[in-house]
Amino acid sequence: ADPVANETILDGDHAVCHVVAVTAAKMNGMKASLDGFTIKNGSSQFSSVGSTTIGGVKFYQSYGAGIFIGNATVDILNCKIVDNTDIRMGAIRVDAGAEALFDNCVVADNATKSTTTYNCGGLWADGAKLLRINNCTFSNNKASGVAPCIYVFGDTGGKTNVLISLS
């Protein structure tokens, strides 16, 4: 099968808080992988910051409309994370000791609706154990507060060959 001609789309249809939510017990040599997906149209409409706890990780309903990764080891490869809108953390949230690799991904046209200072349109990492971003493009992500594109709290890893435009 040709993944370019036969795109696999995970579409939240503007009706879900997180199109993809990942948490799993961390074990040496084990990880979850998403490869070649388009993840789009996640849209949290909640103005409050309610949460659901899964495996000891709080998944906040207004954070990470496209992907929320909490306390798991995950590789996101060759994915497009696009057109997600959230109250506070637009497209991606990496949290609670998570270890994440983003490689050859496009993160574009995501936004946060919040006008507070605690928001980000693209990728927000706070409490992540390891975050690596390689060969990725971040473009046209919007936020009015802290970071339209990428916000990383603490030293969590490396970023190489990352293109940021119109954010």
Regions flagged by a language model, labelled:
Residues 30-41, 73-85, 99-113, 129-142, ...:
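Right-handed parallel beta-helix
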Residues 6, 30, 88, 119, ...:
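Residue-level signal for beta-strand positions within conserved beta-sheet cores that form or flank
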Residues 46-49, 115, 146:
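Short, hydrophobic secondary-structure boundary micro-motifs
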Residues 1-35, 40-72, 93-97, 125-128, ...:
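Extracellular beta-strand-rich solenoid/capping regions of secreted or surface-exposed proteins
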